[in-house]
Swiss-Prot record:
Subcellular location: Cytoplasm; Nucleus
Encoding gene per record: STAT5A
Lineage of producing organism: Eukaryota, Metazoa, Chordata, Craniata, Vertebrata
Record family assignment: Belongs to the transcription factor STAT family.
Molecular-function annotations in GO: DNA binding; DNA-binding transcription factor activity, RNA polymerase II-specific; RNA polymerase II cis-regulatory region sequence-specific DNA binding
GO biological process, one term: positive regulation of mitotic cell cycle
Protein name: Signal transducer and activator of transcription 5A
Changes after translation: ISGylated. Tyrosine phosphorylated in response to KITLG/SCF, IL2, IL3, IL7, IL15, CSF2/GMCSF, GH1, PRL, EPO and THPO. Activated KIT promotes phosphorylation on tyrosine residues and subsequent translocation to the nucleus. Tyrosine phosphorylated in response to constitutively activated FGFR1, FGFR2, FGFR3 and FGFR4. Tyrosine phosphorylation is required for DNA-binding activity and dimerization. Serine phosphorylation is also required for maximal transcriptional activity.
Length: 794
């Protein structure tokens, strides 16, 4: 019930958005009186696409109806009488609505609960700046709702005026028929005698003159009514067009932009419910006005009166048709975009939705939607209305889907769940452009009939640009193309034009957004991190971020040309950082344990005055996705050391925390945090007992130059091998199998190569699994392989 309590505290626009969620499909009173029961049911456990879950959905429907009936029976007193009737009515209504489609009830309640939670979360997480933004947004939404109220009133006014015009015209026609009857009576006067004819003729003439004068005046009045009504419709359509522009060209375009940025890791684009409610109100008012205009045209045809009205009505009729055409074609949107990096022969999904499908009764004749993949050039031709019918650049399997109307949520949508790109036809590439820079788009098209087939619309919508790959190795460069396009695409562009150069601060914003999303962290890129990246990209030594604000970055600098002195591009290096953090080091990054964006010289400057054993973790310059340890330790040869970088492959063998735990001479995480305080919760527990007489070997990180230091600092800490009570463990002299490896594992810069020690480790593991009797006791043990410390080398 806590969710409903929080939802009731929503204010302003958030409260209005919550109210939109409810209606006849699920009354808000049911949510209120059954809040605790509703929130305790397993709505999310039901798979809406699995027919076998229908029985569970039916049980939930029956439970809901029973709870409502019980709640109704418990109502007593004068105030409870009306509530008892109302709750009983709701129980019957829900039973009748969902009896044949219980899955729709589940879909409806899940939709409501999800959006309630989202609104509460957004309200709770809003900062002061976000509050200002929400206030501005609420003000804008308030203005939209006020305009709808104004449109409702003027539409009601023209409806009243139309009825008055119709009544006036009907009375005019009656009087006109009376005039014709008088004229017929004049023809009959010839049959009367002269005296009687003269008497009757005088009376008829007076009546005719009076009636003709009235008809003339009334015809002018009718014409005036018609002109005034047409003018009112013109003003209504001006207001309608203005409101539609705000909703379609501002609000809907902003939603699409948020959807595009969400592809780069930006905040979710948000629900379409408010937009749909606005579009449905537009559709309703537009249709009411269209019907009024058609009735006015019928009245004019019924009683033609020369004047400007026919031309005015033709104009407003054409205008209202344009407005409704724009509404229908613009509200056919892609709710769930296909993946923007699209691999051939791989299943993918997408969802399209018509925001006005319910109000315009499009669902009465469910339309079919077809998806095809087209090239950038074909997309340009399509928007120019050039003849590109049936042209495509590949073959998509399962590319047709019928739109379904979900009564509970009022949505008309088509869910493509099992599409697959079978093949792709590429265009001739330009200059240095690679296949991962070539953009395609998925075209969704359909045909909608509106108003009993009065109007038929051919609708099309294009997905965000997609890059097609055939191998996973192309994914990183394809992602760079998508990132650049999503970040820097301008509204209303020609497909898929994007600036070749952007300012460094613009790129910083895009990189930070992507970084936080990929690493799934609120700890984004700091000012110091961005300075480091700028130095790397521009090959500069300036340490002031402001010095880079006016500098431009080209696409070639970003991911076509290698960085000076290296065999990789800027994006490839940055993407490698995100990859290793995402796969192995999210908690360490969030803990602030990884400094990361510092070079070797900066690490030297940071550590030089620190106590021995102080270390930091930084991203390697020489190895994409590599992390190296730099530490302070005075020796006759040097006082700063750098371990050869670890990569994703290394961390899949032994975690970073365990490797650091093995190196006992690493004591403080820069600047002065005890290592175990930071990393001990991530150490792999050491098992003390053998299983079935066998002990499980472990790999241990060892740096030969520091074996003595490690042993001294480890003191008397027992290893797993020492602690194991298994009888299979023989005295240490029995492990004299290999002489010490004479090759150093620290390079001339003090970097340790893990690969050169891993072969030894694997060989030892193999020997540990052999029977003890087969071991040769004559060989001396390799120095440092079985030193006391955390874990054992296997």
């Amino acid at each position: 019930m806590a969710g409903w309590i929080q939802a009731q505290q929503l204010q302003g626009d958030a409260l209005r958005q919550m109210q939109v969620l409810y209606g006849q499909h699920f009354p808000i009173e049911v949510r209120h009186y059954l809040a605790q029961w509703i929130e305790s049911q397993p709505w999310d456990a039901i798979d809406l696409d699995n027919p076998q879950d229908r029985a569970q959905a039916t049980q939930l429907l029956e439970g809901l109806v029973q709870e409502l009936q019980k709640k109704a029976e418990h109502q007593v007193g004068e105030d409870g009488f009306l509530l008892k009737i109302k709750l009983g009515h709701y129980a019957t209504q829900l039973q009748n609505t969902y009896d044949r489609c219980p899955m729709e009830l589940v879909r409806c309640i899940r939709h409501i609960l999800y959006n309630e939670q989202r609104l509460v979360r957004e309200a709770n997480n809003g900062s002061s700046s976000a509050g200002i933004l929400v206030d501005a947004m609420s003000q804008k939404h308030l203005q939209i709702n006020q305009t709808f109220e104004e449109l409702r009133l003027v539409t009601q006014d023209t409806e009243n005026e139309l009825k008055k015009l119709q009544q006036t015209q009907e009375y005019f026609i009656i009087q006109y028929q009376e005039s014709l009857r008088i004229q017929a009576q004049f023809a009959q006067l010839a049959q009367l005698n002269p005296q009687e004819r003269l008497s009757r003729e005088t009376a008829l003439q007076q009546k005719q003159v009076s009636l003709e004068a009235w008809l003339q005046r009334e015809a002018q009045t009718l014409q005036q009514y018609r002109v005034e009504l047409a003018e009112k419709h013109q003003k209504t359509l001006q207001l309608l067009r203005k409101q539609q522009t705000i909703i379609l060209d501002d609000e809907l375009i902003q939603w699409k932009r948020r959807q595009q940025l969400a592809g780069n890791g930006g905040p979710p684009e948000g629900s379409l419910d408010v937009l749909q409610s606005w579009c449905e109100k537009l559709a309703e008012i537009i249709w009411q006005n269209r019907q009024q205009i058609r009735r006015a045209e019928h009245l004019c045809q019924q009683l033609p009166i020369p004047g400007p009205v026919e031309e005015m009505l033709a104009e407003v009729n054409a205008t209202i048709t344009d407005i409704i055409s724009a509404l229908v074609t613009s509200t056919f949107i892609i709710e769930k975009q296909p993946p923007q990096v699209l691999k051939t022969q791989t299943k993918f999904a997408a969802t399209v939705r018509l925001l006005v499908g319910g109000k315009l009764n499009v669902h009465m004749n469910p339309p079919q939607v077809k998806a095809t993949i087209i090239s950038e050039q074909q997309a340009k031709s399509l928007l120019k209305n050039e003849n590109t019918r049936n042209e495509c650049s590949g073959e998509i399997l399962n590319n047709c889907c019928v739109m379904e109307y979900h009564q509970a949520t009022g949505t008309l949508s088509a869910h493509f769940r099992n599409m697959s790109l079978k093949r792709i036809k590429r265009a001739d590439r330009r200059g240095a452009e690679s296949v991962t820079e070539e953009k395609f788009t998925v075209l969704f098209e359909s045909q909608f009939s509106v108003g009993s087939n009065e109007l038929v619309f051919q609708v099309k919508t294009l997905s965000l640009p997609v890059v097609v790959i055939v191998h996973g190795s192309q994914d990183h460069n394809a992602t760079a193309t998508v990132l650049w396009d999503n970040a820097f695409a301008e509204p209303g562009r020609v497909p898929f034009a994007v600036p070749d150069k952007v300012l460094w601060p613009q790129l910083c914003e895009a990189l930070n957004m992507k970084f936080k999303a990929e690493v799934q962290s609120n700890r984004g890129l700091t000012k110091e991190n961005l300075v480091f990246l700028a130095q790397k990209l521009f090959n500069s030594s300036s340490s002031h971020l402001e010095d880079y604000n006016g500098m431009s970055v080209s696409w070639s600098q970003f991911n076509r040309e290698n960085l000076p002195g290296w065999n990789y591009t800027f994006w490839q290096w940055f993407d490698g950082v995100m990859e290793v953090l995402k796969k192995h080091h999210k908690p360490h990054w969030n803990d602030g344990a990884i400094l990361g964006f510092v070079n070797k010289q900066q690490a030297h400057d940071l550590l030089i005055n620190k106590p021995d054993g102080t270390f930091l973790l930084r991203f390697s310059d020489s190895e994409i996705g590599g992390i190296t340890i730099a530490w302070k330790f005075d020796s006759p040869d040097r006082n700063l050391w750098n371990l050869k970088p670890f990569t994703t492959r290394d961390f899949s063998i032994r975690s970073l925390a365990d490797r650091l735990g093995d190196l006992n001479y690493l004591i403080y995480v820069f600047p002065d945090r005890p290592k175990d305080e930071v990393f001990s919760k991530y150490y792999t527990p050491v098992l003390a007992k053998a299983v079935d007489g066998y002990v499980k070997p472990q790999i241990k990180q060892v740096v030969p130059e520091f074996v003595s230091a490690s042993a001294d600092s480890a003191g008397s800490n027992a290893t797993y091998m020492d602690q194991a009570p298994s009888p299979a463990v023989c005295p240490q002299p029995h492990y004299n199998m290999y002489p010490q490896n004479p090759d150093p594992v620290l390079d001339q810069d003090g970097e340790f190569d893990l690969d050169e020690t891993m072969d030894v480790a694997r060989h030892v593991e193999e020997l540990l699994r052999r029977p003890m009797d087969s071991l040769e006791p004559s060989l001396p043990p390799p120095t440092g392989l079985f030193t006391p410390g955390r874990g054992s080398l296997s």
